Design a protein with these regions (language model features):
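Hydrophobic alpha-helical membrane-insertion segments, chiefly the h-region
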Residues: 16-26
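Exported/periplasmic cell-wall-interacting domains
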Residues: 5-9, 117-202
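N-terminal Sec-pathway targeting helices
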Residues: 1-15
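N-terminal post-signal-peptidase region of extra-cytosolic proteins
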Residues: 47-65, 71, 88-116, 135-140, ...
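Ser/Thr/Pro/Gly-rich low-complexity linker/stalk segments immediately outside membranes or between
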Residues: 27-44
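Extracytoplasmic
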Residues: 61-63, 70-73, 83-87, 108-110, ...
Length: 202
């Protein structure tokens, strides 16, 4: 009986350590939400769920401009004629209020930039690069004796964690990037035109 209890205790301890390791990884390494649900839209607002249920855009769509509205955690995609094609719910930097000024401040930039890069082999599924910092950003940071930072992307989930899906929306978790689900970055990666404009509003 004692052996059975000992084995059960050891098994329980292993499970506890595994769960604890996952918790630490999410909290420290990726900044992802601490509590995740398998249900893709569980616990999200009606607005977020509605946006997530939108159909895929036609394969011949062209996205010429993106507008991120930080206050409501949404990103609008417009075609070459200025028509709204789709709105995506997003997560932002872990310290999202205000314009990004320095490396490591956790803020998502504000202002007008372009999509200047794309990476199909990102550590976060795929990504589209945002042209932050611009000259004004670099000049301001340098005047303070600091780096403006950079490497701002629109990206999906950390590789191997795509199943998190829309649950990432429960919390702003990036280091300044704009996060969407893997399916959404697949769509954006395919349809956003090179050098497309991106405007990021407060």
């Amino acid at each position: 009986m004692m052996k059975k209890k000992t084995a059960a205790g050891l098994f329980g301890g292993v499970i506890f350590l595994l769960i604890g390791g996952v918790y630490v990884f999410f909290k420290h390494e990726s900044g992802m939400p601490e509590s995740l649900s398998i249900g893709n839209t569980a616990g999200l607002s009606a607005r977020q769920q509605s946006l997530l249920q939108q159909p895929a855009l036609p394969a011949d769509s062209e996205i010429a401009k993106l507008v991120v509205r930080k206050a409501v955690r949404e990103m609008d995609a417009y075609d070459t004629q200025g028509r709204l094609l789709k709105t995506y719910p997003v997560a932002l930097g872990f310290n999202p209020v205000g314009h990004k000024q320095f490396e490591g401040d956790g803020k998502t930039p504000e202002g007008r930039y372009i999509i200047n890069d794309r990476n199909p082999n990102s550590g976060y599924h795929k990504n589209l690069g945002v042209s932050y910092p611009n000259d004004a950003d670099r000049t301001y940071a340098a005047a303070q004796g600091k780096s403006a930072g950079g490497d701002i992307k629109i990206h999906g989930m950390r590789n191997g964690m795509g199943a998190i899906g829309a649950q990432h929306l429960h919390r702003d978790w990036t280091h300044g990037c704009i996060a969407v689900t893997d399916g959404e970055i697949d769509e954006l990666y395919a349809l956003v035109k090179p050098q497309a404009e991106i405007e990021i509003l407060p």
